[in-house]
Amino acid sequence: MQVSVETTEGLGRRVNITVTADSIEKAVESELRNVAKKARIDGFRKGKVPMNIVAQRYGASVRQDVLGDLMQRNFVDAIIKEKLNPVGAPKYVPGEYKLGEDFAYAVEFEVYPEIELKGLDTIVVEKPQVDVNDADVDAMIETLRKQQASWSVKEGEVGAEDRATIDFTGSIDGEAFEGGKATDFVLAMGQGRMIPGFEDGILGHKAGEEFVIDVTFPEDYHAENLKGKAAKFDIVLKKVEERELPEMTAEFIKRFGVADGSLDGLKAEVRKNMTRELKNAVRNRIKAQVLDGLVLANEIDVPAALVDGEIDVLRRQAAQRFGGNEQQAMELPRELFEEQAKRRVIVGLLLGEVISKSELKADDARVNALIEEMASAYEDPQEVIEFYSKNKELMNNMRNMALEEQAVEALLSQAQVSEKATTFNELMNQPQA
């Protein structure tokens, strides 16, 4: 077997392999002997068919199978010999085969990038310093009350926390546009559901009024034909409602799993949940900064095969969220996911190198702690823990999470870390990277 390796483009490789005619014939003869032991041909006993008859009957198909097998086995031998690490499925490019002659073919594939980690001491991390205080707990309880509120019709103007039922028709330069019309649309004020200026135009008006709002669509609006455009909305205000908050009775409090129905019990439960959420938010914020710094300091080539695979994963996840099937998932435009997929591949490759260089292995105590932390959000934590312990796939996922945490901590130990005081709301409402 003769082997040569070419670099095609970037991480692309082409391995050229030549298999000698002698090795092909030996492999064909060996396989024909195996076939002869099992062959059933009229006029001959099983295993007693002459080799020339076996060759006539099965020679062509056996030779085809042997060539396919030799191509695969010799490719594996070649990449081991050349110390190549392929990504994805290789593409076989067979040459012309002539009986009695050497057979040449090529295999095209991508390899993993060679990564030499650098700039780890240039990673900058601001570690949030924050606690859950009494005011945070009170604000969260008020939010829970608002979520459970009822609505009643009110006289007078639309206020900042009211709800309005409207008809609207949008137009640009006097022409209506797709998606710009609705009837009996219920709009809760202060939630930022509409484009800037729309809610402000509703405030202060009364039921029965008809008026026009002038707004401008943001430059980053999702519809290309509306980006940055000035528009008018004709509004019919049909109904104004105000929120009626539930009383803090024992019955109301028990809805949140507080058995004794006491306000102190509710505050304790809310604080516990907020503390758990805060811990996750702090961890995620630190992790995001570490990974941003790692990616910024280490520019690497990315195998297209890995990006393609990650795009398919993201497509399926998106389809699942909206109740779509496999076919619908694959029809989603790859452009929607390409940037995120590439980022995930880069992070995965760099973290893999950190794990390898640091010789990290998933710590069992950390794995168990992660499972217990996750289970604490459920009504019966022990049941969840036992479920995970019996599920191999879930346990592998948790080990990977633990290993990723350990890699982030290894990077954090080399980073430039400072502390920054913040509040619960600031941290929880901060956009995630």
UniProtKB/Swiss-Prot annotation:
Mention any one GO cellular component term assigned to this protein in its UniProt record.
cytoplasm
The kind of enzyme this is, by top-level EC class, is isomerase
Cite the InterPro entries for this sequence: PPIase_dom_sf, PPIase_FKBP_dom, Trig_fac, Trigger_fac_C, Trigger_fac_C_sf, Trigger_fac_ribosome-bd_bac, Trigger_fac_ribosome-bd_sf, Trigger_fact/SurA_dom_sf
Presence of keyword Cell cycle: yes
Residue ranges annotated for the PPIase FKBP-type domain, each copy included: 161-246
Entry GO MF terms: peptidyl-prolyl cis-trans isomerase activity; protein folding chaperone; ribosome binding
User: According to its UniProt record, which reaction does this protein catalyse?
Assistant: [protein]-peptidylproline (omega=180) = [protein]-peptidylproline (omega=0)
Superkingdom of source = Bacteria
Q: What is its EC number?
A: 5.2.1.8
Q: Where this protein primarily resides, as one coarse class? A: cytoplasm
A biological process from GO: protein unfolding
Q: Which UniProt keywords apply?
A: Cell cycle, Cell division, Chaperone, Cytoplasm, Isomerase, Rotamase
Q: Gene3D superfamilies attached here? A: 3.10.50.40, Trigger factor ribosome-binding domain (3.30.70.1050), Trigger factor, C-terminal domain (1.10.3120.10)
Signal peptide location in the record?
none
Subcellular localization(s) per the UniProt record:
Cytoplasm
Q: What does the similarity note say? A: Belongs to the FKBP-type PPIase family. Tig subfamily.
Q: Which PANTHER family does the record cross-reference, listed alphabetically?
A: TRIGGER FACTOR CHAPERONE AND PEPTIDYL-PROLYL CIS/TRANS ISOMERASE (PTHR30560), TRIGGER FACTOR-LIKE PROTEIN TIG, CHLOROPLASTIC (PTHR30560:SF3)
Give the function comment from the record.
Answer: Involved in protein export. Acts as a chaperone by maintaining the newly synthesized protein in an open conformation. Functions as a peptidyl-prolyl cis-trans isomerase.
In the UniProt entry, what is the domain comment?
Consists of 3 domains; the N-terminus binds the ribosome, the middle domain has PPIase activity, while the C-terminus has intrinsic chaperone activity on its own.
Q: What is this protein called?
A: Trigger factor
What is the protein's species of origin?
Edwardsiella ictaluri (strain 93-146)
